[in-house]
Amino acid sequence: MVHPPPPPPRLLLVALVGLLSLREVVAEPAEEAGTPCPEGLWPVPPQVLPRVTYTQVSQGQAEGIAFFYHPCAHPWLKLQLALLAHLYVAKPTLIPDFSLTWDRPLVLTAWGTALELAWIEPAWVAHWLKRQRRRKQRKSVWFLSDNLFGPTPTMPASRRGKLCGRRCVQAPTLAFALRSWRPPGAQVTSRGSGRSSISVVKRRGLRAALGLQSTPPGLRVSLASSQSLKAQQLTLGTSSVAPVSLTTGGPGGNGRSRTEAQMPSGQGNHGGCACPGQVSPAPRAAGPPRVARGPTPRTEEAAWAAMALTFLLVLLTLATLCTRLHRNFRRSESIYWGPTADSQDTVAALLKRRLPLPSRRIKRSRRRPLLPPTPDSGPDSESSD
């Protein structure tokens, strides 16, 4: 009997453990090993929105990124925090802290601010780190104008909070894949409207937690669907889909150019980690090709309507041209209005000239004979008459 292959999350976990050498990370520090939890390990807390606070940190930690966790937190959360630390920071700092609470046992501090988490959300963490990094750079412009492209002389390069190091291999893809991991006993919500509503709530919650500040379209957090998550888990070595672009922030001469990496506007691809000597990630895999649809009744009706309108427009144009030509055509002289020398005839003259005159009746006298006299008739005949 052939056993089914393990699910994608397990394969991904094994690959990450072997890739990132987590034996150094998962091992508990000496200070944590001797502090047992009186009530045992805490269960996994419910998933709540992250909270951003301002902290007072030492001078050594002011310019770096540190990851705090409660020693009694669930081991699954510790493992996720360790993976996240190695993905985003070259030399992560994992510090146990007993002052954390059960509802938010994980805290990420960077440049004087802290992000308290209940679960590991790589998309939110990456977006928050990106914003904090840019705020820090905007502040440093006013005070360190001469050293914009390098570290300050008083601060070592390792404390600059470098977000990408030697182990940055497809970091955005791995970090985004962490979002699909569920702790033991957690139920995965079904696909459909429920998942879409949860994603909308998470987007709104992220904006509320981060201060309701507008971000450029290239930095907005995009929550992928379950199908894209499975595809990213299966194609770990080739895919490079990420919710946000991680910055390098290195101390080199081109550190600012790597930090301010621009997104290609045409493809909407959020690039991977821009490490030195690393091949640029492949563009985002396009969706299934759209099948060409045939003409529908509505499109045919629209085509006929367009043809009819075109015909009417042509007909109207021809009629207008014909009217213009007819008006400009020189007609012959009228039989009623003849040409005049001075064109100053009066109405009476026109009527007298044009109206037909009545025929005169000739009056005949009674004494004149109707017939002319004959030569035979003489004066006798006249006297007899």
UniProtKB/Swiss-Prot annotation:
Compositionally biased tracts (Basic residues): 359-369
GO BP of this protein: negative regulation of cell cycle; response to UV; response to xenobiotic stimulus
Region (Disordered): 242-297, 359-385
Parts of the chain that traverse the membrane: 302-322
Signal found in the keyword field: yes
Topology Cytoplasmic: residue spans: 323-385
Keyword Cytoplasm: yes
Name of the protein: Tumor protein p53-inducible protein 13
Species classification: Eukaryota, Metazoa, Chordata, Craniata, Vertebrata
Gene name tied to this protein: Tp53i13
